[in-house]
Amino acid sequence: MKILCRILSCLATVCITVACSSTAHIVIRDGADYGLTAEFIPSSLLEKNITHLLKQKSEHTDGQSVFNGQELKEAFTKEGISVQDITLQGALGLRFVCTVPQTHELLEDVIGYDKKERKAVLRISPENIVSFLEILPQESRDFIDMLMAPLFTGDAIPPAEYEELIGAAYGKKIAAELRNAEFTLTVDVPYKVQTARISPAGTVTVQTKTEKTSRALIRIPLLELLCTVGMIEVQMQ
């Protein structure tokens, strides 16, 4: 349970930051590898502020990505994950496409799929995220540490207080963007979903793709996600 959520972490983490276009797409299949595609495109304000802070901490140069594509690919490959594409865009932009064996141990605590019962459960928790972050290259972890989010630190901070913390550290404009931002996750499952729910925060809507497949669109307010100290769980049955 390391890389998939590390990605869902790096995305749900990084991406999770503030005003940006961030999406993740998981495809659950019967008898085949699961697919994962994710993309994070930061707002110009976010990239400008984070880049400025990184330049103060290190020898970071304009346009240089905070991620190392080769290191990320090697980390995924080491975990038995097939990487189709990793694209770096500017300093913070990231897009990747990969497939994960459905029996891979990294899926156990993140995605639970019962083929017989036709039920899927997705879980996001601080414990899951921490274990994922440990595998990231140091540079990526340094960037994530700058967010100071309860989801990563385990410290209980109310959303309003965390918003104030971000405002004091990175400016009121970024804090305002964070207040209105969402993380969007699309999940395709190989069965027709009758009921879907998410708790304790967020919304989930279901679309029927075919008579035998469904797609769930999950939206979670970033403030709620970043301040999670318990578990966010999505059930589709």
Located regions from the model:
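Bacterial N-terminal signal peptides that target proteins for export
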Residues: 1-8
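A generic structural micro-environment signature
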Residues: 7, 26, 32-34, 195, ...
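Residue-level signal for mature regions of secreted extracellular proteins and peptides
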Residues: 10-13
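C-terminal motif of bacterial Sec signal peptides marking the signal peptidase cleavage site
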Residues: 18-19
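Mature, soluble, non-transmembrane domains
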Residues: 73-237
